[in-house]
Amino acid sequence: MMPTQRLAEADPQIAKLIREETRRQAEGLELIASENFVSPAVLEALGSTLTNKYAEGYPGKRYYGGCEVVDQVEQLAIDRAKQLFGADHANVQPHAGSQANMAAYFALAKPGDTVLAMSLNFGGHLTHGSPVNFSGKLFKIVPYGLRQSDETIDMDEVARLAREHKPRILMVGASAYSRTLHFDRFAEIANEVGAAMVVDMAHIAGLVAAGLHPSPVPHSEIVTTTTHKTLRGPRGGMILCREAHAKTLNSQIFPGIQGGPLEHVIAAKAVAFGEALRPEFKAYQRRIVENAQVLAEGLKSAGLRLVSGGTDNHLMLVDLRPKKLTGKIAEEALGKAGITVNKNMIPWDPEKPMTTSGIRVGTPALTTRGMGSREMTLVAALIGRVLDAPADEQVLARVRGEVKDLCAHFPMYADRV
């Protein structure tokens, strides 16, 4: 017989921890660039009975019966994704961005083939060739980086390495890069050497959807993304591609690397894509960028150095070496003050990955709460105060109180705290 108790009765320990996490999110400043807050509608879809349904295969071609409804759900997600990004084909089944990238590699290359990708040390992602990741274990990785003069991608180096190594795949994208990615120039290089171009737009997908960052779709064989971050959907992945690659790509996801899709998550993706198709989503993305630029100027006014001097998108990297701090110390001190960031490697970082010389800061979550330029100026000042006295418990306590007061003016998930 099915248990009928609600969570608070059935498992009070988990219920309590969920309330605590909701309170932490509601009462603190979330500045991790890869995090955001989903809408109540997305949460509702995630908690739906769709979680009960197994649906191996694709709409209209399932290996299980009873898929009439989930076929419609998944097709809605596919159609909305294609409309949102102007793509020929969309696969909404990847459980995460890593699976999306794995499928893209397997669709276009064989183990041992050469992949030219941005180094993790300069802002790339683990799945772009880190030796501890499947991508670095299965493929020959040639990394590209930044120019020291302005800390932007060295396109001359990309072209030189492409001509020298003739990669099968040119992987474009980053997890800690604050400047515009010029996909047209990357595509010229890929075409010159006969490489297939794959773009991982996980961080900037929302900006791309809103027309605030150049779209990779017209230039790329395959585009991968997560569905959270700036896109403000559930945690998950997605792949866009040209029709010529659709069949191969689909087979790489299922049965290649995944079994049954998570239809409750796919429903939540569909809801988020529907939200992103509305005019107010473009206004939201504009505010993300505006807030990032105001926050960047505020951090510089607080005496902090930003990698490349600023930002074109939703995030920025703060170089803490002038403050004689590590990213680990800064993350911990800011956390005590109710400000959540993540320690992050900076270009040519002398520290280890679990220590780092920098922090990464982003504005999507605070923008979702409704905060604007005035609040960004205040947040920058609060960060500056903490980093000027990271070991002063009185300063941290005062800032934490101010953070809580600020958050109270922008309530979130009030019915869940």
Swiss-Prot record:
Pathway: One-carbon metabolism; tetrahydrofolate interconversion; Amino-acid biosynthesis; glycine biosynthesis; glycine from L-serine: step 1/1. SUPFAM superfamilies: PLP-dependent transferases (SSF53383). Its main location: cytoplasm. (6S)-5,6,7,8-tetrahydrofolate binds at residues 120, 124-126. GO terms for molecular function: glycine hydroxymethyltransferase activity; pyridoxal phosphate binding. GO terms for biological process: glycine biosynthetic process from serine; tetrahydrofolate interconversion. It catalyses: (6R)-5,10-methylene-5,6,7,8-tetrahydrofolate + glycine + H2O = (6S)-5,6,7,8-tetrahydrofolate + L-serine. The keyword Amino-acid biosynthesis applies. It is found in: Cytoplasm. It comes from the Bacteria. Its EC number is 2.1.2.1. It holds the Pfam family SHMT. The modification N6-(pyridoxal phosphate)lysine is found at residue 229. Keywords: Amino-acid biosynthesis, Cytoplasm, One-carbon metabolism, Pyridoxal phosphate, Transferase. CDD domains: SHMT. The record marks 228 as: Plays an important role in substrate specificity. Its cofactor is pyridoxal 5'-phosphate. Belongs to the SHMT family. Homodimer. Catalyzes the reversible interconversion of serine and glycine with tetrahydrofolate (THF) serving as the one-carbon carrier. This reaction serves as the major source of one-carbon groups required for the biosynthesis of purines, thymidylate, methionine, and other important biomolecules. Also exhibits THF-independent aldolase activity toward beta-hydroxyamino acids, producing glycine and aldehydes, via a retro-aldol mechanism. This is Serine hydroxymethyltransferase. It comes from Anaeromyxobacter dehalogenans (strain 2CP-1 / ATCC BAA-258).
